[in-house]
Amino acid sequence: MSNSNIHPTSIIAEGAKLGKNVKVGPYCIIGPEVILHDNVELKSHVVIEGITEIGESTVIYPFASIGQPPQILKYNNERSNTIIGSNNIIREYVTVQAGSQGGGMITRIGNNNLFMVGVHIGHDCKIGNNVVFANYVSLAGHIEVEDYVIIGGLSAVHQYARIGKHSMIGGLSPVGADVIPFGLASGKRAVLEGLNLVGMNRKGFDKAESLNALKIVQEIFLGEGNFADRIKQAQEKYKNNTIVMQIIDFLEHGSNRSFCSFEKTMSLRGELQSNLTKQPN
């Protein structure tokens, strides 16, 4: 790599590995066990430490901090990892912290993600592909976020929670439980408001199947009887609805947290959402 791509004010420790066409702007610090793959760009004032790997064509903006130790009292200088995939955009003041002994020693982020200003990703988080975290989203430790998730600004997610694929969480919404795939959740204590029908339509999901899935999800969460029995009944009855089956699979493989559910008053919004989408174009 040509040294002309590295600003003279930046500090790159001996042992760091930089791929082809890596660009390092002013006042960056890169630790000795960092790997930057081809075409990575650090704008300026970026700090990357620890055993950290950044995938191809990821762009990191000023004052981001990647790979620092986890914010936990029991951390004892274990050698943990941070792995970030390709084509990510990591904006100003984003923090991504390394894994811990209690979570497999690794924080992992996939490809094609956008993390806006001030996002915090805690230790041992597992982030998928094509997610968008708006400004100042904060994830505690051990959180799993699946593909195509959108989280609105200033929202926070409780440790060990899971956020299912294609779901959307509104801004200013603390999430204390698992959010089902395709779910739409928000509120001062986030509740399930329905399914992310707009996002599903944009991704090409069948409209009729999506609307039917919304009704089935309401049956599962708001119906009578035992919750586990309602899941089993829906699994047998609606096995041809691929959206529902993905949601049921998520429910059957739950974490130790509860599921983000409808409030009784919020079920009316789900019904309204369903009715509105039935209106002619």
Swiss-Prot record:
Q: Which SUPFAM superfamilies match?
A: Trimeric LpxA-like enzymes
Instruction: Tell whether Lipid metabolism is among the UniProt keywords.
Output: yes
Which InterPro entries does the entry link to?
Acetyltransf_C (IPR029098), Acetyltransf_C_sf (IPR037157), Hexapep (IPR001451), Hexapep_transf_CS (IPR018357), Lipid_A_LpxA (IPR010137), Trimer_LpxA-like_sf (IPR011004)
Q: In which pathway does it act?
A: Glycolipid biosynthesis; lipid IV(A) biosynthesis; lipid IV(A) from (3R)-3-hydroxytetradecanoyl-[acyl-carrier-protein] and UDP-N-acetyl-alpha-D-glucosamine: step 1/6
Q: Which NCBIfam families match?
A: lipid_A_lpxA (TIGR01852), PRK05289.1 (NF003657)
Which purpose does this protein serve, as stated in its record? Involved in the biosynthesis of lipid A, a phosphorylated glycolipid that anchors the lipopolysaccharide to the outer membrane of the cell.
Protein name according to UniProt:
Acyl-[acyl-carrier-protein]--UDP-N-acetylglucosamine O-acyltransferase
Q: Which gene encodes it?
A: lpxA
